[in-house]
UniProtKB/Swiss-Prot annotation:
Similarity comment: family membership: Belongs to the protein-tyrosine phosphatase family. Non-receptor class dual specificity subfamily.
Residue intervals of the Tyrosine-protein phosphatase domain: 3-154
PROSITE patterns per the UniProt record, alphabetical: TYR_PHOSPHATASE_1, TYR_PHOSPHATASE_2, TYR_PHOSPHATASE_DUAL
Active-site residue numbers: 96 (phosphocysteine intermediate)
Organism superkingdom: Viruses
GO biological process, one term: negative regulation of MAPK cascade
Annotated protein name in UniProt: Tyrosine-protein phosphatase 2
Gene field: PTP-2
Amino acid sequence: MYEASQIDEHVFVGGYYGDNEAMLRFIENHAIASVISLIDSDVAPIRHALGLPVGDHIHVYCEAAPTCAALPNAMPALYDYMVRRIGEGKRVLVHCYAGASRSAALAVYYLMRSRQMPYQDALNAVQSKRRVAINDHFVRFLATRCSYRFVNDELKPQIV
C-alpha cells in the first residue's frame, strides 16, 4: 500500500517504499498527472512502472546530507513546474524516501510562494496534513526565503 498526504487541492507529499505498483495505483486513484522524485538513486524503475509521459516525471538527484545543494538550487524551477502543471489542471505528487524532509521542504516552499506565507505558517500547514521532519539545512534555506514589506500600511511577507 502506498501512502501520501494531500497538502492542498493539487499537491501530495509522500515517500518511496519500493512498491511501484502501489504507487501507480495511488496516482491513478488520485488523478495525479505529475511526479517529482527527490531521491539519491536511479528512478528508472519508478519511471518505467508509472508509465508517465516525458515531462510528467521530474527527478532531482538529491541527498539528505547537509552538503547537498541540489534541492535548494532546484526549488524555484520546481515551484515553476508545479505552478505550470497545476495551471493545466494537473495534480502533483512530490516524494522522497520517507516523505518527511526533502518532499516536505518542497511542499513548504510551494505554500510559501503560492500563498505568500512565512515559513512557520507554511510548515504548520504541511504538518497539519503529514508528520514531517525537515532537515536543518533545508529549514535554513526556507527560512531565508521570506522577507517583509509594507503594503497599504500592513507588514506583508514576500517570498522569493
